[in-house]
Amino acid sequence: MIAMNESISQIDYQQVIINILYMFTGGSVVFGNICIIGTILLFRHLRCRKELVMVSGQCLGDLLYGFGFLVGGGRRLYLFLNHMEKVPVSPWHCMSAEVATFFYLLGPQAGALMNLFVGMDRFMAVTFLNYYSKLNSTYVVGAIGAVYLYASISYGVGFVLSYFMPREKTVVLQCLSTWASTPSYAVYYTALITTAEVTGIVLYVIVMLILKYRTMTSHPSLQHAHHKRQTKITKTISLVVLSTFLFYVIPWLTHSALNALQVKLGKAGLISPLLWVLIQSNNVFNVIIYLWKLQERSGPGVHTHEPNGHRRHERNFVSEYKS
């Protein structure tokens, strides 16, 4: 009985709570992004819009990242409850045997690059109006495919580098994402995500300045009508960008700095795990924003009392946003 009480007292309940939060936020992100992607694919007048298909590609990256937190949080919770969190393993074990590592490394890279591409898409939409209106689904599929191809190759490079690392048991079975890679790959991984996110935010600042200038100087015309329509989705995504900056980029940079300083500080306590929870909370906020706006856009095309009204309204909606 005494041994059992000692075993129970050794459980790190702070880490148990943190990993439950990981699972909760990760599960919320997965569920929310499935709803967003499903809504866009379900309604034809939504999936015919280039910018919304691009958003669905962005949400896929967040979904992968959230799934990594869901699986990884469950795995670590099991380890802490069974006193296995400090079992030594090699980085290669983390890369090859832990499912969550795949999502931890692939999801953030794909999500950050998609944020950058969405920013570039919005920049083209408000700057090169005529050119953007002529782009078709090939452009969107190509952009999303290029992002996920690059992210997959990038993950593959990390996988190969980890294979050639010494098989010494230098990490523990918790297998935090960057522990599975070489130091140089960890630097590249952090730099890629940070650069893509910050560049996307800078692009959005430029886009909002262009929109403000156009609003002040524009006059009634077909081009102005297109500008007004593009402004709606741009303002929606700008809310997501603001949320990303406050609750993703700043915590991400802080977490990266803590990782670099942990060699000197020794232990970051609860700060680092709570930053990860905050980062995932950003994805929850983004899900709420997108679902709120998609609900407004999906409603009109569904409620109709005319036999063919839905199809006619849908075609008008599509033609309106293709102009």
Give short role names for the model-derived ranges.
Residues M1-S323:
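Seven-transmembrane-like multi-pass membrane architecture, highlighting hydrophobic TM helices
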